[in-house]
C-alpha cells in the first residue's frame, strides 16, 4: 500500500486548492477526495440516492433527479437524527469505495493524498500515515463561508461551531499549512512536504487503510 497523507481542515480552509497543488507536482501523486466519493455514490440511479429520497421525500431532488445537496445539508444540520441516519447510510459506502480506490491506485502512486474534511470528527486519523492540516483564522474562514454559500453570518457561525475547534484539530496534525493569505504563499511549503512524502513512501509499512 502507498504512503497515505490525510489532508484535512475546517470548512473553506482551502483543501481542494491545496490538493490540486500537490497533484500538479507529479502524476504519481494520487488524490482521493471523500467529498467527491460521496457525490459519486449518490448520483441518480444509485441505491444510496434511492434510499435518501425514500427517507427525506422527493422534494430532496432537483427536477432532473439529482440530489439537492444544499437542501440536504440544511436539513441534517438542524435535525441530528436525520444526520445520524444519513451518516449510517453513507459512511460505510464511502469507506468501501475509498478502500477500492486505494487498492487500484497504490501500485502506481508515490503517495496518496486522502482529502477528508471531517477526519477528526469521524475518528479517521488512525488510518493515515501522516496528517496534514490546513489552518485558517476563524474570521477569515467565516468570511469565506458567507461569501461562498451566500448565507447569513449566524448560520455560518453555527456551522463552524458544529465542527471541532482549530486547536483540537491542530493537536492531531503532523504538519500544518497556513492559508490566511494568498495561495501562492503556500507553494514552497507544499513543495517541501511533497519531497518529504516521497522519501517517507520508501520506508512506510504497507497496510490496508480500514483494517485497524
Swiss-Prot record:
User: One biological process GO term for this chain?
Assistant: coenzyme A biosynthetic process
Q: Which InterPro entries does the UniProt record give?
A: Depp_CoAkinase (IPR001977), P-loop_NTPase (IPR027417)
Catalysed reaction, written as an equation = 3'-dephospho-CoA + ATP = ADP + CoA + H(+)
Gene Ontology MF annotations: ATP binding; dephospho-CoA kinase activity
The membrane spanning regions, by residue number, are none
Q: Does the keyword field hold ATP-binding?
A: yes
**Enzyme class at the top of the EC tree:** transferase
**Keywords, sorted A to Z:** ATP-binding, Coenzyme A biosynthesis, Cytoplasm, Kinase, Nucleotide-binding, Transferase
Q: Where is the DPCK domain?
A: 4-204
The record's subcellular locations are: Cytoplasm
**Is this entry keyworded Repeat?**
no
Q: Where does ATP bind?
A: 12-17
Known pathway: Cofactor biosynthesis; coenzyme A biosynthesis; CoA from (R)-pantothenate: step 5/5
Give the GO cellular component terms, alphabetically: cytoplasm
Q: What EC number(s) would the UniProt record show? A: 2.7.1.24
Coarsely, its chief localization is cytoplasm
Question: What role does this protein play?
Answer: Catalyzes the phosphorylation of the 3'-hydroxyl group of dephosphocoenzyme A to form coenzyme A.
Q: Give the record's family classification.
A: Belongs to the CoaE family.
Q: Which NCBIfam families match?
A: dephospho-CoA kinase (TIGR00152)
User: Would you tell me the protein name for this molecule?
Assistant: Dephospho-CoA kinase
Organism in which the protein naturally occurs: Blochmanniella pennsylvanica (strain BPEN)
Q: What is the lineage of its organism?
A: Bacteria, Pseudomonadati, Pseudomonadota, Gammaproteobacteria, Enterobacterales
